[in-house]
From Swiss-Prot:
Biased composition (Polar residues): 118-134
Annotated organism of origin: Homo sapiens
Residue stretches of biased makeup (Basic and acidic residues): 604-615
Subunit structure, interactors included: Homodimer. Interacts (via the BTB domain) with HDAC1 and NCOR2.
PANTHER family on file: SANT AND BTB DOMAIN REGULATOR OF CLASS SWITCH RECOMBINATION
Pfam families: BTB_SANBR
Description of its domains: The BTB domain is important for homodimerization and for its function in negative regulation of class switch recombination.
Gene coding for it: SANBR
Protein name: SANT and BTB domain regulator of class switch recombination
Function: Negatively regulates class switch recombination or isotype switching in splenic B-cells.
Domain of life the protein comes from: Eukaryota
Region (Disordered): 118-142, 555-622, 692-718
Listed GO biological process terms: isotype switching
Record's compositionally biased regions (Basic residues): 580-595
Lineage: Eukaryota, Metazoa, Chordata, Craniata, Vertebrata
Amino acid sequence: MSRGYSENNNFLNNNNQMVLDMILYPLIGIPQTINWETIARLVPGLTPKECAKRFDELKSSGSSPVDNQYNSLMAAGESPVETLATYIKSSLLDIHGEFQETPVGHDAVSKTGRHSIASTRNCSSESENCTTHNGGEMTEESEGPNMVIHVCDEAKNLKEDFTCPRDLLISEMKYFAEYLSMDAQRWEEVDISVHCDVHIFNWLIKYIKRNTKENKDCEMPTLEPGNVISILISSEFLKMDSLVEQCIQYCHKNMNAIVATPCNMNCINANLLTRIADLFSHNEVDDLKDKKDKFKSKLFCKKIERLFDPEYLNPDSRSNAATLYRCCLCKKLLTKETERRIPCIPGKINVDRRGNIVYIHIRDKTWDVHEYLNSLFEELKSWRDVYWRLWGTINWLTCSRCYQAFLCIEFSHCQYHSETVVYPTAASSLNTVGTGIYPCCNQKVLRFDPTQLTKGCKVRDHMVTLRDQGEGGDLPSCPTARMLDDLHKYRDVIVVPFSKDTVSDVGVGLCDEKGIECDVLLEPNTPWGPKTGELNAFLSLKNWTLQLKQQSLFSEEEEYTTGSEVTEDEVGDEEEVSKKQRKKEKPKKFTRQPKKQVSSPCAQRKEKALEKSASRDVSPFVMSMQKNKWDATRSLRFNQDAQREDDQRRMTEITGHLIKMRLGDLDRVKSKEAKEFAGGIYSRLEAQIKASVPVSARQSSSEKNTRSKSRFGQGRPA
């Protein structure tokens, strides 16, 4: 038979043949189904079909072909075939209640970790099949060899060993699957030691053995407020997913009782904290009774993180803070959702193609959201208040009184007038047609205001109607109703006090001082221009940008100088050109001080600077045009200085334009406003007044002053 075997099975070499025969011979006469895939894994280079074919040959022959080759081993008292038969019967067959007895020596070997690892590697697939055939019920026979876990409780100075079937340990505690894998290369000795509380690990062992026969009559271990945190942390480390979910659900339902126990909540990692926080609504977190603040602030911090998560669908907040930024013009905190609803300064009001007013905000790139949150925490002193303030910053509602969209933090900022507007008749004043006045504060208003911005001298709470488009008839369930309830419940933290916004009011209020200055500077001499206190709001909006440009030109002409106008080398050239002009101007401007012609050179320089600044205020554009040309009548030094000033002006304009593109209009305006007139604001006002008064009026006033002085001089005693 062995000769026929060698002829008919040329695909086997001698070593594989002997190993396969040793494995298959003990299976002869056993009626159970054999898992040929598991047997094929034991012998490299063989397929399940080849193993089955060889098994049929051995059954037909009826004797083992390797008995003669292993007589020496059998004579020594140890039969490898019998030893292997015990292993095969316990792990390679689909057994239904038979062969339940294991050798006594097997337990001793398994406790030391020997041979049990080999069994662990090879019986996993068969145990999976057993689970399938038995309808998912884990039996002791299909759970593989027992593994011993050494538990060390360093806090209590205790050590205890626990025994658990290998397959059950892997299926319940997936942490050990990596170390008890089926790779034949890892069939080394494994010693499992766990540093954990003995009572907690005992609870975990009872939990994973809850469906076994030996614990069928035992009570199911239960979660308690005192042990759920420790079990949660241990089960998460051991990758017991089902138990982790049970612990998280238990924490959600019994958090008040848990925080009252002396448990350490700092051991909960960020992943578990996020999963627990997602089960809580912000109202439930706020209602927690956590006197020592062991867990409440952590939940609110996670809620703040969720507000900034763009992919998270937050049931507590309709808006998201992922796009939060601050406008550098109106200083409001906005998101992509609120930037077109919340008004900015009048200069940034636009009209879309459908005729609706839209607002364009400019992002302040110097603002940082982390610094903002830290400053909020320093101000409010708790993460709970920080969350509610941030929630009110990103969520918005619409007022049914003023028909304006408002942020929840501005709930008490609905502006109104206590008295109705009064419009004068056409016969009373021709200059105020279409302009009314509020008697309560004397604020002027247009009859038809295109800006549609609500302004008032008093504030009150906004009024919100609970009608959501597309919502059902259940108002308490709609987002607007829930948001309004939260706003009323926590308004002491959410709502910020009202403060008059001077930046956003420019050009809107007709009695506003900045708006008056704007239009007076633009067109001071036009007969149809607005008078003091009678500004047109729409024109002030229209000319906002022009006024900023003209102010920047004024300040630039005052600043761009290298001192060439007052150098000693240039005095002669300037005297030749401007002698006649000064002779004509001196009787008009300096009749009060006739002795200035013999003053010091420093006084002459100051006088020239004042004259030049006054002439710049009168005609700034003409001065800039003259400096752009090379003057052949002047010296080389003068032209070089003028060219240098022109280059400096160009570079400053380029720099200012780049700053404007990067930081916005407001920083540009502030930088220009910081550069005052060379002689101060009063000298600028004086120059503007002198430029606006006709020459004849100035001449007559100067003559009157001269006559009065002469009369006083004659009346004095010698």
